[in-house]
Amino acid sequence: MSCGKTHGRHENCVCDAVEKILAEQEAVEEQCPTGCYTNLLNPTIAGKDTIPFLVFDKKGGLFSTFGNVGGFVDDMQCFESIFFRVEKLCDCCATLSILRPVDVKGDTLSVCHPCDPDFFGLEKTDFCIEVDLGCFCAIQCLSPELVDRTSPHKDKKHHHNG
């Protein structure tokens, strides 16, 4: 798939992918017992209703935006994120919620690269951005397990024999 080529009803492969992501999320949120979209989200696992994803511009760069600008919500600081959840889709325009990147302690990170060594997981937020999906050339879905990921036991990494 390359930019600018026709890929279905929306004539944009990113639009088609986001439409499928939204359908999967909605199927889980409605607790649909039988559905066609079960490869990423499992309706029997409570709380897993988000397929996080990255989007890339037409030059291959990661799209990023900011959440909690001014630091007005809760005790969260302003953060930059490259991680999104689709909330609404109309034609090729989408409302994306900004997922908050956190470290293993649950502290807010500003993440501009998915392989940042401090990045551990994602938290859903109420911060949203409206985007024209036609401005993007690629999308990468990530594991739903990243959202509300629980901290591993610290004892697992270092074992000392007495």
Swiss-Prot record:
Record-linked InterPro entries: Spore_coat_protein_Z/Y
Domain of life: Bacteria
BP-aspect Gene Ontology terms: sporulation resulting in formation of a cellular spore
Keyword annotations of the record: Disulfide bond, Sporulation
Compartments in which it is found: Spore coat
Family: To B.subtilis CotZ.
Complex and partners: Disulfide cross-linked either to itself or to CotZ.
Name recorded for this polypeptide: Spore coat protein Y
Protein source organism: Bacillus subtilis (strain 168)
Gene: cotY
